[in-house]
């Protein structure tokens, strides 16, 4: 395995776990890629939603990247506005433009985000062509848009069911930007497929966020799969002892997700 590191212009850190090329498994020398975007309320990036998640997808045969994107560490810093999305879209662009080097299929690049990182992952699919993103990256095409989106207990809305801290760190008091970042109102028919999971008992980011997204995706006929688990709270990541949230039932999301991606990408080990 190769370990890859890259620093984006903002200082955001991209790391990659890349499977080695081999003559013994030539059919798998080119693999799909997945970019992990940890949560943390846009204030930090959770380690529990980084490597433990990456290892699950690495085991499923993916080349895996993790992005530590720009965050607002305290209230003395200005709102982040578009910078996290510029970071994430820039990471997707970097993966695609280096697909041959990374032995990645450039048409099979997924993103996976949790909580605020879920908002960011969804934004890469929904707001990839927003003017601030296109201008910052110098692109006018779909190079920075993912081919599939995986969301765990995502922040979606800036409305009444929002996670206030995440939206405050992202938008501050800018009402227009808050409206733009309320993603359930930005859905359109040309989006990539979504896989979404949430717990009904989540007391931090309401399950209504995922339900609002699912409703909007349904309205616009965007393919998606939604899994709701009754018990457990927020930030459960892989639902294992390693991340201090063991739940044998809820951890089924990992297998459900890798099966969904395998069918979508026609990539079966």
Describe every region a protein language model picked out:
Residues 1-29, 160, 164:
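N-terminal cap/lid segment of alpha/beta-hydrolase-fold proteins
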Residues 30-39:
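Short beta-strand element of the alpha/beta-hydrolase
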Residues 46-47, 67-106, 245-249:
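Catalytic nucleophile-loop/oxyanion-hole region of alpha/beta-hydrolase
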Residues 47-65:
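Short amphipathic alpha-helix adjacent to the substrate-entry channel of hydrolases
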Residues 90-166, 178-179:
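Primarily recognizes the serine-hydrolase "nucleophile elbow" in alpha/beta-hydrolase
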Residues 190, 195-198, 202:
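Short beta-strand/loop motif that positions the catalytic acidic residue
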Residues 203-212:
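Conserved alpha/beta-hydrolase "acid-adjacent" motif
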Residues 211-269:
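C-terminal catalytic histidine-bearing segment of alpha/beta-hydrolase fold enzymes
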């Amino acid at each position: 395995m190769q370990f890859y590191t890259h620093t984006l212009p903002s200082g955001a850190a991209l790391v990659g776990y890349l499977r080695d090329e081999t003559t013994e498994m030539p059919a798998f020398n080119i693999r799909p890629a997945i970019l992990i975007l940890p949560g943390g309320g846009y204030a930090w990036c959770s380690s529990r939603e980084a490597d433990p998640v990456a290892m699950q997808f690495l085991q499923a045969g993916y080349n895996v990247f993790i992005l530590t994107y720009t965050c607002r560490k305290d209230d003395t810093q200005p709102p982040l506005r578009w910078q996290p999305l510029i970071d994430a879209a820039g990471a997707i662009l970097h993966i695609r433009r280096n697909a041959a080097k990374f032995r990645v299929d450039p048409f099979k690049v997924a993103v996976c985000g949790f909580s605020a990182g879920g908002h960011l992952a969804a934004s890469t699919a929904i707001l990839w062509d927003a003017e601030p993103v296109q201008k910052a990256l110098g692109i006018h095409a779909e190079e920075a848009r993912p081919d599939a989106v995986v969301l765990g207990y995502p922040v979606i809305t800036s409305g009444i069911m929002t996670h206030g801290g995440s939206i405050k760190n992202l938008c501050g008091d800018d009402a227009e930007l808050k409206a733009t970042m309320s993603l359930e109102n930005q859905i359109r028919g040309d989006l990539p497929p979504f896989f979404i999971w949430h717990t009904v008992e989540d007391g931090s980011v309401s399950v209504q966020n995922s339900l609002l997204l699912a409703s909007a995706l349904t309205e616009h006929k965007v393919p998606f799969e939604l899994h709701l688990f009754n018990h457990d709270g927020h930030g459960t990541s892989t639902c294992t002892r390693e991340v201090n949230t063991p739940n044998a039932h809820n951890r089924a999301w990992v297998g459900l997700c890798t099966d969904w991606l395998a069918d979508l990408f026609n990539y079966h080990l």
